[in-house]
Structures are given as C-alpha cells and as structure tokens.
C-alpha cells in the first residue's frame, strides 16, 4: 500500500523547492477515497491497507483533515434511506420496535459476521484436542510405545498455529461487520431522533426536556455500539458451553455433570440478578434524565444564578438528584457485581468439583485428560465471562430501544395548510380557528374562534394587554399550536422574527444569509434598513465576526436586528414579527419601522405584534386581543371611534384618543445623526481572527499520569490499592491452583512409580494434594468475589466524586468560560463522559488488569517450565512492543478526534432545540438535517477508523500469540524425553489462552485509555480559572451591610479578557444613598458592563468600586451579590414550582410570598389554581407570557429587600401595561433604595435624580436630567430629540417636574396625552 505520508527529503529535493512546498501542504489522506473500499482480498484479510495510516499517525499529530472520506455505505444519507423504509413497515405494527426496524434494515449484514464467527468458535476447540494428543505423544515417547511419526509434535505445532490463524482471520472479519452494524444502529438513532425533535408537537415538547433528548443520542444510542461489540460472544455462548461440556464428557466422563450441575444451580440466581438489573436500570435512567435536565437548565441560566448568588441552592438541586442516582447506581452495580462474581467464580469452582470427583472416581489423574479438560474449562470462561456483561448491556439496550421507540412515536406538529389558490393574494388566513398549547391539559391557554386575515401588501398590527394571547396568535399562524377546530392556511413563504432572537453559532453574515445564496446588493441593502452597518464597523472582522452561542457577544438590540435582517434577507412573502421593536433603541426602532417594515417590506404581507402604540396609525389594520379572542379589528381611527376595548387599552398605555402618531421617519434626523460622530465601544470582543467560541482542544500524547491518579484518588486511594492487591492475589491463586493440579499429577505419577519399584513413596498423599487443591481453589473464589465487590464499590464512589467536583468547579467558573464554551460541549461532559465513568470505565480497567496479569503469569509459568522458550520469546516481545508503540499513537489520535467530533453533534442539537420554531418557519428542516448528517459522518469516520486500527493490531497480536503456542509445541517436542506430561499439559493449556488474553489485554488497554479520555476532559473543566471565593472568612461584611447604599466608582477600567481593549475606561463618579440613577447610551456604550463590574461577573482591571465606603473587591462574591438585587432584561424562570422560583432557599413564609404577588397583581392568577404557590413552572417558564415572567422576576427582587437595585433594561420586552405596573411597584417599594436603571424607555428614567450618559466606555454626562437637557449639543438632548417631537416635549416636562419637585402622578394628569404617545424611548 502506498504510504501517503511525505516521501523522503531526498526524493523531494530532486523535484526542487517548489515541489517540496506543494507536497508539504498535502498531509495524510484528506479528500481521498477510503483505502478499505479499494483494497484487494488479501489486503482486506490482513488489514494491510492500514499500514500507511499507522505510520502517518506515528509521524504526525493526527487531524480530522488527515482522514479519508467515509465509505459511501457508511454515510448517514445511505443509512437514513435504509432505516426510513424499515421504520415505515414497523410503525404499522401494534407494538412497533425501533430495534426490530434496525435489525430489518441491517440484520442481513450481521448474518455474514455470524458465519465468520462460527468458524472462529470452531477453531477454538482444536487447541485442547491437540493438547491432549500432544501429552499422549510425550508420554508414549517417554515409554517408547509411540507408533506415531517422531516428528508428529512438529505437525501438531503447525496444526495448532494454522487453525488458530484461520480463527483469527475469521474473528476480525466478523468484528468488522458487527462494529459496522452497531455503529449503523447508533447512527440511525441520532439521525431519527434529530428529525423527530424538529417535528414534535407542542404537547410532546412540553413533556420532553432537551436533557432527555440529549440522553437519547448520547447514552441510549451508544448502547447499540457496546452491545454489538460483544453480541456474537453472547449469541455463541450457549453453543460454546454445550460443545465444551460435550468434549469434557468425552475426556473425563460423568464428573462433567457435577460441573454442569453447579452451572445449572447458578442460573436462577443469575436470572434473579438480571431481573433486578433490568428494574434498577429502568429507574436509574429516569433519574439520569432528571439530573441532566436540571443541569442543562442551570448551565443555560448561569449568569442569572451568579447574579442572584444562587449557586448553593441550585447545587443542592443537582446534587440531590445525583445522590439519588448514585444510590440506584450502587444497587445496579451490586447486582451486576453478583453476576460477574458468580460467573467469574464458576469456572474455578467447576474445576475443583470436576477434578475432585474425577479423582475420587478414578483414584488417579491422567495428565492428557486433565489438562485437555482444563483447557475446555478455560474456554468456558470466555462465554461465561461475557454473559454478565451481555446481560447488563442487553438490558440497557432493550430499555434504550424502548425509550427511542417511545420518543419516535410521540405526536408531531401538523404543518399549516399551504394554500395554492392562484386567485388569493399571499397572506395568513384563519377561519373559526380554536387552538391550544396542549390538548392533554384542560387548563391549557389557547385561542378561541379566531377569524383573521392578513393578505397582500399590508401591515397588520396585533395589540393587547399582557397575557392576552399575542404571541399565542403568532405561534398558531406558524402551526405551533394544536388545532381543536377551524382552519389555518398560509399562502406564500414565511419569515419569522421571534420575541427573543434566536442566534446560531456562526458568523454574523451567516446568521443573516441563513443558508441562502449571497446576493451582495440585497445583503448590503438589508444591513442598511436593519441599522446594522454601524455595528459591523465596530468589529475588526466586520460581518465575518463569529457570533457566539445564543449571541452572547451581542447586545439584546443587536441580536434582534440580526434576527430581523435574517427575515428581510429571506425575501419571503409573509412576515410574522413577534414584538421585535421592544429590544431596540428608540431611534433604531423608528428606523426599522419606517425603513424596514414600511419600506423594503412594503410590498409584503407583514404581521407585527407590538407594544409601541405610536406606530398604530401607520398600520393598514389593527387587531385587538383579549383572553385569547379577537375583540376588535380595524384601522387605528376606526377603533378609536368605536370607543370599545381598544379605547380601554389606550387608557392603560396612557394615550389620548385624539393624538396622532408621529409620522416622521428618520430622514429628518439623519443629518443630525451624521453630524454627531458615534463613538461606541465594541460589544463583547472576539479574538483577532474573529472567533469567540473556543475550539475544543485535543490533548496530545498519552493520557497523562495525573489523569489516572485523578481517577485513582477520586474513589479513595486505599480502597483502590486494596482492590489492586486483590487482583494480584486473584491471578496468583488461580495460577497456583492450576500449577498445583500439575504438581499433584506429577507427584501422583512418581508415587505410583515408587510403589511399582517397591520404594517408599515420598511427598504428599493424593488426599493431601486434593485438600490443598480444594483449599487454594476456594481461596481463589473468595478473593475473586471480594475483589469484584470492592473494585466496583470503589468505581461508583469515584464516579460520585468526579461529578461532584465537575459540577462545583463549573459553578465557580467565571462567566467568560460560559461565553466561550458551547453549551453542548459542557452537556457532553455530563452525559456521555459521565456515563462512561458511571457504567463502563470500571469494567474496562478490571478486564485489563485481569487479562494482563494473566498474560504475565502465563509467560512466567511457561518460561520456568520451558526455559528455551525465552529465545523466541525475546523477539516476539520486541515485536509486540513495537506494534503496540505504533498503535498507541494511532489509537490516541483517533480517540481524541472522535471525542472532539462528538461535541458538535450535541452543540447542533442544543442549538436546534432552542430555535426549532424558527427552523420550521423558514423551512430549514432539511438543511439542518444535512448539517446533523455531516457532523455525524465526521464522528463515524473517526470511530470506524479507530475500530479498523483495533483489528489491524489485533490480528498482528494474534499472530504473535499463536507463535508462542507454536514454539511451545516445538520446544516440548525437542525436550519430550525430559519434560513431564503434566508440565506439557500445563504449558500448552496456558499457551492456548495467551493469544486471546494478549489481544484482549492490549485492546482493553486502549479501551481503558479511550475511556480515561472522559476523565481527562472532565479534569480540564475541573482545572482552570475560577472566580473569586464565594466567602472570605476573615473579611466578611457586617450583617446589615450595606446600610445606606451609596456607590463610588473610582477610575474603573474593565476588559472582558486579558489582551482585549477595555470596555469601561476610567469610570469615576459617586452615587449617594437612595439616589435613583438612570444610565443611558448607545448600543455598546458600556451600560451592561457597569452591571457586570458591580456584581463582579467580570473583575475590574484597574480602579475600584466601593459600596458604603467598602471596596467590594475585598468581599467574597456571595456576600456581595446577595446584598444586591437585579431585574435583568431577559426574565429567566426554572422548571419546578412558583415557590422555588421566588424563594429558592425557602426562607420566606407563605403570607409574605402572597403579599408580594398581590403587589405585582399576579395573586389572582395563582389563587385560582389548586396548586397555588406550588403551581408548576415549565422549563424556561414557557407556560407564562414574557410579561408575567418579568413580573415574577420583579417579585424576586422585592423579596430580597435590597439597598441597591439594578434594572438592566428590565422592561424592554414587556408591554406598556406591564411596564407601568413594574415602574409603579419599583417607585413604591424601593423608595429607600439606591436604584440604577439601564433604560430603553427614556420616560422610565427622566424622573431620576441623575442620569449617567455613557459613550464609548466613558461617562460623557452625569447630572440631573433638567441640567443635562440645557446643553443643546449634549448626548442626552440628542437622545431625547430622537424619540419624536411630541414625546421629546413630554420628556422635558418630566425633567422639569423632577427639578421642581412635582409628583409623577401629577405630571401624568397634567400631560397624560403625551405619555407614551410615541415609541417608548429605547436606548
């Protein structure tokens, strides 16, 4: 096979320097067809096609780009087609099974492996038979009675070697098929679960958490690979046992049935243990799902948890679930240990019973029969050893299959009817439509008897108070709700902008283009109308900058504009926009409305949910919702004249009915805007190459010793040491038992000879030898049982400790870690990696130690008995170490790349589940399915290549092991006159086992190293940067700190990461106790950075912040954050109960919670339910509207009774009514607090004591509002003017009223017609 590595330097130099450069760029097999597909019969038989790749891995650090293309028959596209047909047949059955469908699709391939494996199994029985004949040959040669050819020993050597090699060839061909079949079943689960996830109905989604879905594609899918890896061993276990027993009977007669009786007696116990395993595993998986679900939720909301100093509460939530999971894991492990211990002890116990009975019956031992029988008993260890593993994995596979089947049978979303009537214009048509979020729940919110049309070139606006059903109407149009009655139809393509923008982890341009072809002219136009050009100029990489997961390096307004730009660029026919203007600045909102919605989209059907009353006069039609029903519709003026619900709604917003909307667009302001040079600080910065999300790094070289040490100490070093001593005692006692059998037979023969010669026999009697044999054998059994229990007990403790360390370490990580690390990558640690540590790693380590100690014992034993064997053994050992050395480079590289290529699958799943509504709206299902297939193909390429390398090594190790057997026969033949028959039997019986043990031992070593990569990856997260301590014992604030709530910023400089430009540049100011400070500024000016610095989510680079004269840097983070309160822009609720969301530490009595709910006007909502404070909150609070979520978050702040409150654009995403309620509650309840308000709506802060205007990370202006407005060239003046002429007048009156000391309610009565007339100013 041609080595695709770089050729020798000399060869390249003859071609000139340019040629060298050209060749050096092409490393490995990247882009080439898989050599396995092109290889001939001999190359496939010996796996020699992999030779060049092994050398390549030795010379280079392996990269994914070095791998060849995945074979066509292994690609996801091919597998998807195969399973689709099979599942279509299966789903028609009363009780469909996905596993059965998989067997139907790929079972024929597995039949080929059965054929090869049957030949391999047959070859295993040749060795013991030749052993018996070899002993007979030696005995007869010694006695001179042999009638066979004197060279027969050499012929036996060739026969044993030849049949063993045939068996090896067949075994690895069988393995080639089983591995592929297991991987195919794993792949189709990942593919079909993904497809199903983007089709699930809303009721199905509400009952299935993202954590559960991730578990299906990680743990459950992985079971297929694990089971198929040993499936043939299990299928042939019973035939092997029967054949072994039959041959045993042929050798030693009826004592065989004594051993059989022991095995039969163990079956009920094994069956009971297997039953318990099944029950425990099923419950255990449910607990694992729950733990992963909560962990995923916490990781997504880590910023909020840190801001509230809720780490302890949520740690308890996860660790309690983990403790319950560990209890079940202990139970599961103990039942599995019983199986392993019993089946591990049965061969030894059977040997003792069989040989004791044989001796008792015959009165002597025949070396040929005894050691031939011993070989058969050793053969029994293989099927018996695999049975507990197969039972455990089989149970897990059965449960996994059931879970996957149940998931795939969940109801799917019914797509909205596509209208193809050419006479109808594009638009949305709803006729007598009654829909609900969840049909299964009677109290589920929905829409009633909706008749709605939005068609042609029109702008329809949807308004209503909080909880009226505005977003529900949008979801119904998209087909996300379940239809009870009526019809919903859409003509034309759809573009959708959700209330909370969905951003993918890609470049800014890719987020906008969203898979469509690039039309540069349209793209530039879209950037202009969506007000993104200035933002793009701020990034050094322009629109090629990478947008982090969930858009973490963009502000809320930027994310929303990117979302709008995606919709506009799609050039759809119908635009459904769910309150997109709430998250953007006022002047940007006006620009978007006039330039985008009424500009570039003027020829489209636009449906706009809005809380901005001032834009209603520009709508062609307005729809008013109340309690899930349309109560009014018409133009703005028609609705005003009707004086019905719309008029009441205007009063809630404080708008005079006679007022006209501000009909100016931003053309008039553009000149002023251009004159005022915008100095805006960059948003969270990415690195110089444009990347923000860090690539997952693969460690190079062997797994470090400290990783193994980490695992050793995790479960208790002394317990591990105790288990290791027991491993040695177990191997030693078993070897000694077999050696004693040989010694007994030799001594028995010598006693017989002495008696025949009339001499006094020496040594122990046969009965004494029997007693020692039984005693040592029983000790061996006891050691095996104790070792098994102690080691697996240790393993569960280690798993518990590692999870505890990992979770606690993540809670202490700085926010920059979560900004740069995709959620899917972190979740992978808590699913796949932790599953390996929980369930698999201990088995691999135990098998590795058992096998390698057995090999070592064999080599020592046969070298002592046949010293001449050391001559060929030396080069064999050298070859073994060379092969193993080369293989480890290959194996390590592939293992790590396989692990790295697995994370993108989880990342993509996570991203898809967050944006499934957008994906469906834009009809991007197939595009995302192809992305999933590409990621899966990359991962499968690594995995299948790794398995091919295992076969490459295995065959060569088998060859070396078979050589040991061959040379053992050769030297026994050479020394047949001096070697005892019992030693011949002992040497050959052990030599026969060395091939399997050596091969399995090395592969287990590689497998153990692979699984240790999980410990290594988790250790990477345990190490690394951490936040400051939660509590500093010798520097704690007084219990009543802060008493006043004064804040001082002293030359504060802050940057997001070392090496990046500062985002806050020398902030210096003093805020007096109880002052109400408004903070304004353009996007990226540093408003939210002030909050991050105050809460120390990012530490100051220079300068300081003091509260009540105390430098906050000297306190622990918990002491600081628990004494502050924040109402963030995006309201975050957690699955659980209302009580848990309000009071995670359960510190407040019920009456206090109800009192707070009264204050925010939500008590009626919950008092009307039976659960009350225990009302269920679904994941992300999806069973509440955004306005209700924000009110609940306000209630959290009220319960804290803080001296300092921060409002971080807290009312940006709520309607005017909710905004008014929140503002009134804050004024009333927090009058004695210092309040910092980062505002989008200037009317919420114009009555502040002072306003801080930030520009480019510096304080541009800081004074009373009225004073600042006297400066006609000031930035605040410009921002006020941007809100529109009438609203600017109102804002100035607010500032003047504040200066003159008038009450805000008086101001409202004086000038109510101006209140919120135009866009509530957004900054």
Curated annotation (Swiss-Prot):
Disulfide bonds: none annotated. Residues 110-396, 720-1010 form the ABC transmembrane type-1 domain. Residues 428-652, 1047-1281 form the ABC transporter domain. The keyword Zinc does not apply. GO terms for molecular function: ABC-type transporter activity; ATP binding; ATP hydrolysis activity; ATPase-coupled transmembrane transporter activity. One of its GO terms (biological process) is transmembrane transport. InterPro entries: AAA+_ATPase, ABC1_TM_dom, ABC1_TM_sf, ABC_transporter-like_ATP-bd, ABC_transporter-like_CS, ABC_transporter_C-like, ABCC_6TM_D1, ABCC_6TM_D2. It is a multi-pass membrane protein. CDD domains: ABC_6TM_ABCC_D1 (cd18579), ABC_6TM_ABCC_D2 (cd18580), ABCC_MRP_domain1 (cd03250), ABCC_MRP_domain2 (cd03244). It is found in: Membrane. It comes from the Eukaryota. ATP binds at residues 464-471, 1081-1088. Residues 672-690 have a biased composition (Basic and acidic residues). Pfam families: ABC_membrane, ABC_tran. The chain crosses the membrane at residues 111-131, 152-172, 227-247, 252-272, 338-358, 375-395, 712-732, 772-792, 840-860, 862-882, 952-972. Keywords: ATP-binding, Membrane, Nucleotide-binding, Repeat, Transmembrane, Transmembrane helix, Transport. Residues 657-695 are annotated as: Disordered. GO terms for cellular component: membrane. Belongs to the ABC transporter superfamily. ABCC family. Conjugate transporter (TC 3.A.1.208) subfamily. This is ABC transporter C family member 12. The gene is abcC12.
